Amino acid sequence: AIEDPGYPDARNIFSNRTDSLTPAPIDQYGLVVGDHLRNFDYIYTTPSHQCPTGVTMPLSRREQLLQLANESNVVIIEDDFESENNFEGHPIPALKSLDQHNRVIYVGSLSKSMAPGLRIGYIVAAKELIAELRALRRLMIRHPSTFIQRSLSLFISLGHNDAQLKRLGDAQKERSALIMDALARYAPQCRVTPMTGGGSCWVKLPDGVSALALAEHAKSRGVLIEPGDVFFNQSAGNGHFVRLGFQSISASVIDAGVAQFAQALGDMQKRPSD
């Protein structure tokens, strides 16, 4: 089972290896946990900042999911990308940290918090599984750069990573406040999902507005947005969501960018329906 909407690259990877991939619904608290998940072998989830909505799974639901996994012999793949990128409240313990029965495979990366070009990730799982994964990795790449790994280890041990996360959190808090305020002023007809971290926001467009068409029109105004269709298992009927990224954008241009987005949206709403 995989979240729907969810991370498209994970869905594509799994789809290449199985015909039994099933979309699982989410709500304002992330993956919906219930009896519908009991018959799966694996559940893939992004609990810290759900991709693409950005919502955070609360502790009570994490405990509920772990209980279901224990009772039903299910393995959870916890993709905890952007877990450090919080600007509101305190981080919730990872599923893996709550796992008492080795039901969770924890996957993380430093590409979001450090640099996209730093292709270093990590997995926390049972030692037997790690041994198998190391053997499989060797068939693809002998090993990641030892120099980069040692440099990163030193960077973390000296406390520089903690300082980097603090700077990142402060910057994203400022930018998220700016984009939320601008959307409320310029595009009140949109519904924006509340967020507590991450570098993007999930926006539901007014009825009748195509995300794909809006993306093309906004591009002509110098604004790049990501249509939400790609995040759904079936794009049909789900073409009215967009994801707006702000992590790599200067705070000084966010207001003007949202104003242009709203102008493009207004143009689309004036167009006659097909």
Language model: regions and residue ranges:
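Structural signature of PLP-dependent enzymes
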Residues: 134-140, 158-180
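Short hydrophobic/aromatic beta-strand micro-patches
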Residues: 124, 202-204, 245-247
